[in-house]
């Protein structure tokens, strides 16, 4: 197998455990068809025990893959096993995008870029803020914190049920990040221009606790990285309280762009056609 920029017909993957639920093949399949590219992108389920060998197979050319995406639970292992992880993935300790270059596996993390690109598209001017509130301190919150910090947000409040987890993120990302327990939520939302839910609250339509957003800045944006359902209970609450909302689907779509460009040589565009393809698939599986 040749490296991605040398191969006429390239094949890419998404791997996780499980991975059959992934909508990434729909996204990349749409772009391959749109560009008329001879290539493929397919789901390839790998257990945690088998993942190191899978990475070796890619590097040694024992698969037809030029690279691919990595999802739960392999992101941290992908970072550790890659030959050349970049600075973004190094700070996060996790990678979601891999590609072969000169016989080495390179790695990056595009989750944060996907997050801010979604806001850029659907809430223009969102970054003219001084403070943001992040609900949750899991792996997903790391990429969000990194991305909004790098866009210039000076104060980032991380609120979590377990304050120790939030403090770990404050230690990781420096003085811009402040850790809080859930009890501090009413205080830290005061004047904030962005509220981000990175937890599973409201996923699959489950009830979410009531949150009073009234302390947010008048033009604040409330967003959720969950996209099933598209309008989560948390987003409904924020909308009813008069705030701009952004669903999480765009993050999924935009984070896919850099990988496609690496593997297939063309930069795709996230548009309404692609968004509707994914929404239709979500409706079919509701």
Swiss-Prot record:
GO terms for cellular component: cytosol. Keywords: Amino-acid biosynthesis, Aromatic amino acid biosynthesis, NADP, Oxidoreductase. GO terms for molecular function: NADP binding; shikimate 3-dehydrogenase (NADP+) activity. One of its GO terms (biological process) is shikimate metabolic process. The keyword RNA-binding does not apply. Involved in the biosynthesis of the chorismate, which leads to the biosynthesis of aromatic amino acids. Catalyzes the reversible NADPH linked reduction of 3-dehydroshikimate (DHSA) to yield shikimate (SA). PANTHER family: BIFUNCTIONAL 3-DEHYDROQUINATE DEHYDRATASE_SHIKIMATE DEHYDROGENASE, CHLOROPLASTIC, SHIKIMATE DEHYDROGENASE. This is Shikimate dehydrogenase (NADP(+)). The lineage of its organism: Bacteria, Pseudomonadati, Pseudomonadota, Alphaproteobacteria, Hyphomicrobiales.
